[in-house]
């Protein structure tokens, strides 16, 4: 069952779901809460590798990932990050989110931004039960013009669904959780898959 606006408020008020900084209640819609864009970005360095062998030896994959991903780019609140057509970039939400073991989150992009060609997540829109940290966004500009994205703009909407019971293996308790407590645009850690 998805939480409605009054249940989202109640879960925030009671500390069952934590979002920091907490958006004001005006950012809570019928079944979602708006999240804003943070300051942390990463991009792919062009022509730094002919390909990424995502199923190759872990050490080789780690080396390729290090070569192709930029260092963290911090964009000031009053500046813009330009996402050009056909480019994939990573960014974070401004807010940090903490979910209990019996609630899963779903991040959706905004229709108004999608109509300009912006995809907020390429495939990863599930926020696991037990998650804690900022949400990394996988931006892709499928439009024809560069898009200027500014920190603090509303970038997506998060909804919450109550599970049939608490997860036995919530994200924050797993030893293999690769993105636990992430606070920046963390690059892929596919080389850490088991």
From Swiss-Prot:
Biased composition (Polar residues): 180-194
Domain of life (superkingdom): Bacteria
UniProt keywords, alphabetically: Hydrolase, Nucleotide metabolism, Nucleotide-binding
Pfam families: DCD
Residue numbers binding dCTP: 110-115, 128, 136-138, 171, 178, 182
Gene Ontology biological process: dUMP biosynthetic process; dUTP biosynthetic process; nucleobase-containing small molecule interconversion
EC number, UniProt record: 3.5.4.13
InterPro entries: dCTP_deaminase, dUTPase-like_sf, dUTPase_trimeric
Molecular functions per Gene Ontology: dCTP deaminase activity; nucleotide binding
Catalytic activity line of the entry: dCTP + H2O + H(+) = dUTP + NH4(+)
Disordered: region residues: 173-194
Function (record text): Catalyzes the deamination of dCTP to dUTP.
Subunit text: Homotrimer.
Name of protein: dCTP deaminase
Lineage: Bacteria, Pseudomonadati, Pseudomonadota, Gammaproteobacteria, Pasteurellales
């Amino acid at each position: 069952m998805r939480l409605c606006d009054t249940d989202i408020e109640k879960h925030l008020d009671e500390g069952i779901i934590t979002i920091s900084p907490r958006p004001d209640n005006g950012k809570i819609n019928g079944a979602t809460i708006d999240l804003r864009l943070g300051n942390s970005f990463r991009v792919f360095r062009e022509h730094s590798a002919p390909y990424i062998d995502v199923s190759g030896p872990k050490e080789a994959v780690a080396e390729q990932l290090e070569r192709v991903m930029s260092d963290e780019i911090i964009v000031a609140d009053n500046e813009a990050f330009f996402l050009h057509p056909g480019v994939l970039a990573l960014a974070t939400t401004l807010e940090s989110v903490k979910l209990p073991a019996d609630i899963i989150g779903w991040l959706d992009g905004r229709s108004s931004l999608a109509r300009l060609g912006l995809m907020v997540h390429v495939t990863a829109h599930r926020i696991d039960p037990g998650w804690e940290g900022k949400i990394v966004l996988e931006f892709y500009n499928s439009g024809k013009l560069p898009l200027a994205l500014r920190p603090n703009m509303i970038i997506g909407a998060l909804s919450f669904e109550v599970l049939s019971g608490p997860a036995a293996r919530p994200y924050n308790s797993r030893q293999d959780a690769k993105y636990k407590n992430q606070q920046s645009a963390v690059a892929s850690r596919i080389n850490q898959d088991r």
